[in-house]
Every structure is written in structure tokens, then in C-alpha cells.
A protein has these predicted regions:
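Active-site hotspot residues in diverse enzymes, especially metal/ion-binding acidic/histidine motifs
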Residues: 1-183
């Protein structure tokens, strides 16, 4: 596992979100493999509520597993960067498959999850850009699309963040595109 290489690779990985799933899958696997990280799409098991998991296969190899739960591009990319945070910042302490229901009262667990969520959010949408957009936008589709283009992400990623922060999932659902991944 090459931590410094992975840190440097994050902007390249982020750019892949603009491609179609069939176009970015092989490139994503290749970029991550250069850093000692494998990625696999695994089936979603009903009622587990798991979008992703991270585990260390050896001292030099990490496996990130993503499920097709919710099947939307914003959740897929958010989950990828969430798991990459566990790899970069939390190390080999434990595998990071988290059943929220089992751990929501565990302060240490929640701190790691909150940190990974923040990392994913801020990697996809830079905080200063987000703050300016959110403060000054009337949240029209055209504004969302233009903002997404400006920061180099798909509109669905911005719509997903807006949905999560406002609780208005239906309002932005048209921009949140579904993805199909082969498991």
C-alpha cells in the first residue's frame, strides 16, 4: 500500500466521476491498483444498510468493497471517498465494515465515521466552494448544473449533497442518476 501515492492520486480519481460507469471502472481499478488498493463491487445484502467496506488483505494491499445499495452515482462516489478516508487516515486498526445500528452509541466509531463522511464530502465538493454556492443559490436546477460543471463533478453529486443537507430528497431526485455496477 502506497499512502503518499494514493493521496496524490485523489484528484485523478475524483475526475473519473465525470465519465460513464463503463468508462471509469477499469481506469479506477488501475489507478487504485497503482497505490496497492483493490476495489470490488459486491452484492448488497438486504437489511444490512452497507454501502461499502474496507479491509486490509496484507500490509501492502487494501480492499475496498462497494455495494449497489441505492444505486445512485452520488452515493457510489461518496462511499468510495468515505472508504478511502478509512484507508488513508485510520490505517489497519480494524476492518471498516460498519453496521451503524450496532455502533451508533460508540463514540470512537462515530468519530471515525464522521471524519470519513467529512472527507468524502470535502473531496467531492471543496468546502469554500460549497459554502459560497449554498449561501447564494436559489437551488434551481440550472444553478446546480452550472456549479457542478464549475467544480468538476456530475450534477447528481451536488444534488445528493443538497438532498442530504436539506432533507429534500424528492426535490433533487431528477439530477441524481442511477448507476448499474456488475457484481
Amino acid at each position: 500500500f502506497k499512502k503518499d501515492s494514493l493521496k496524490k492520486m485523489l484528484p485523478e480519481i475524483r475526475k473519473l466521476n465525470l465519465l460513464k460507469p463503463g468508462e471509469y471502472s477499469l481506469e479506477l481499478k488501475s489507478l487504485l491498483a497503482e497505490c496497492g488498493v483493490a476495489i470490488a463491487y459486491v452484492p448488497y445484502f438486504k437489511n444490512t444498510y452497507v454501502n461499502g467496506a474496507t479491509r486490509w488483505l496484507s500490509s501492502s494491499k487494501v480492499l475496498i468493497q462497494l455495494t449497489p445499495r441505492n444505486k445512485s452515482e452520488d452515493i457510489l462516489w461518496f462511499t468510495l471517498f468515505h472508504e478511502l478516508c478509512h484507508v488513508l487516515k485510520h490505517g489497519r486498526k480494524e476492518g471498516y465494515i460498519s453496521f451503524w445500528e450496532d455502533n451508533y452509541l460508540n463514540k470512537d466509531f462515530m468519530e471515525l465515521e464522521d471524519e470519513a463522511d467529512l472527507f468524502a464530502s470535502e473531496t467531492l465538493i471543496p468546502p469554500k466552494e460549497w459554502e459560497k454556492f449554498y449561501k447564494n443559490s436559489s437551488l434551481k436546477y440550472s444553478e446546480i448544473i452550472n456549479f457542478a460543471k464549475k467544480i468538476g463533478v456530475k450534477p447528481g453529486i451536488v444534488a445528493g449533497r443538497l438532498s442530504r443537507e436539506t432533507g429534500k430528497w424528492a426535490q433533487f431526485s431528477r439530477l441524481r442518476k442511477k448507476v448499474e455496477v456488475s457484481v
